């Protein structure tokens, strides 16, 4: 059975392409999702994408992934630095999770340097624009394949 990956996009990512293009680029969220779908097919996995500006919706999606998905790819956006709830949900479901960011959060304002998600993720990819998502999906699928073969 092919692996199923839950892809979560946090607050304000619905505005990609128009929001602060100097930081986040001009690629839209729809375009990122299309690229992820194409890569998922190439890698032999399925994905389900969800964007929400609401923390509880994201928590519900993470909890709902239990028994349905083998991994989570998440850009928590601003919730990276504030959400113990997302961190606890990821820890609770114990699914391999990769955290991604379009910008390099460690080169930005000091308050963006801390991630509540990173300690419960298998890895973090930041600073490669929309490619961060593709790199994250590749890394997650590779991790799942290695785990299945061990």
Curated annotation (Swiss-Prot):
The active site is at 24 (proton acceptor), 101 (proton donor). InterPro entries: DHquinase_II (IPR001874), DHquinase_II_CS (IPR018509), DHquinase_II_sf (IPR036441). One of its GO terms (biological process) is aromatic amino acid family biosynthetic process. Gene3D superfamilies: Dehydroquinase, class II. Substrate binds at residues 75, 81, 88, 102-103, 112. GO terms for molecular function: 3-dehydroquinate dehydratase activity. Its EC number is 4.2.1.10. Pathway: Metabolic intermediate biosynthesis; chorismate biosynthesis; chorismate from D-erythrose 4-phosphate and phosphoenolpyruvate: step 3/7. Keywords: Amino-acid biosynthesis, Aromatic amino acid biosynthesis, Lyase. Belongs to the type-II 3-dehydroquinase family. This is 3-dehydroquinate dehydratase. It comes from Thermosynechococcus vestitus (strain NIES-2133 / IAM M-273 / BP-1).
């Amino acid at each position: 059975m092919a692996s199923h990956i839950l892809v979560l996009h946090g607050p304000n990512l619905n505005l990609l392409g128009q929001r602060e293009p100097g930081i986040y680029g001009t690629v839209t969220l729809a375009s990122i999702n299309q690229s992820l779908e194409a890569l998922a097919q190439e890698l032999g996995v399925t994905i389900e994408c969800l964007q929400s500006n609401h923390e509880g919706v994201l928590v519900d999606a993470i909890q709902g992934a239990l028994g349905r998905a083998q991994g989570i790819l998440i850009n928590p956006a601003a919730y990276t630095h504030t959400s113990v709830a997302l961190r606890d949900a990821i820890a609770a479901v114990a699914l391999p999770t990769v955290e991604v960011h379009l910008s390099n959060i460690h080169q930005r304002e000091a308050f963006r340097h801390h991630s509540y998600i990173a300690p419960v993720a298998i890895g973090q990819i930041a600073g490669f624009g929309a490619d961060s998502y593709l790199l994250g999906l590749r890394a997650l699928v590779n991790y799942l394949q290695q785990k299945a073969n061990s």
